[in-house]
């Protein structure tokens, strides 16, 4: 991906030199032409087309933002209730992510959502130990993480 971005920027600057007009609009036009060339050369350049990865990163950010808002609402409900009836619990989350950076990213995203914190990762990197402030059932918690955060983290790391 980094090579594709670099090639795109070099071709954009080359476009400025060829046209002789050094303004922002001309750079954007050159960037778009270079983007087309990078797309055509995607078989030669390593990795998948970088705009797909950028799209997946934006999707990851939006999914995390939605999960963050939902978790904040849940924690607010717990805090403003007059009686305390939440059930905090520890549970083990089994992940099938293989790359270390994906596991770390997933762990950080889980920790950043209010009401959950990652306590550790097993040595074989298949289990994440989590504390939840309001635990319903393990199946619900696991499905919530697997269907949202882990899914988009896996998509970002596919076909690098």
Swiss-Prot record:
GO CC annotation terms, alphabetical: plasma membrane
Record keywords, A-Z: Antiport, Cell membrane, Hydrogen ion transport, Ion transport, Membrane, Sodium, Sodium transport, Transmembrane, Transmembrane helix, Transport
Membrane topology, from the record: Multi-pass membrane protein
GO molecular function: antiporter activity; monoatomic cation transmembrane transporter activity
Regions annotated as coiled coil: none
Annotated function: Mnh complex is a Na(+)/H(+) antiporter involved in Na(+) excretion.
Name under which the protein is recorded: Na(+)/H(+) antiporter subunit E1
Organism taxonomic ancestry: Bacteria, Bacillati, Bacillota, Bacilli, Bacillales
Gene name of the encoded protein: mnhE1
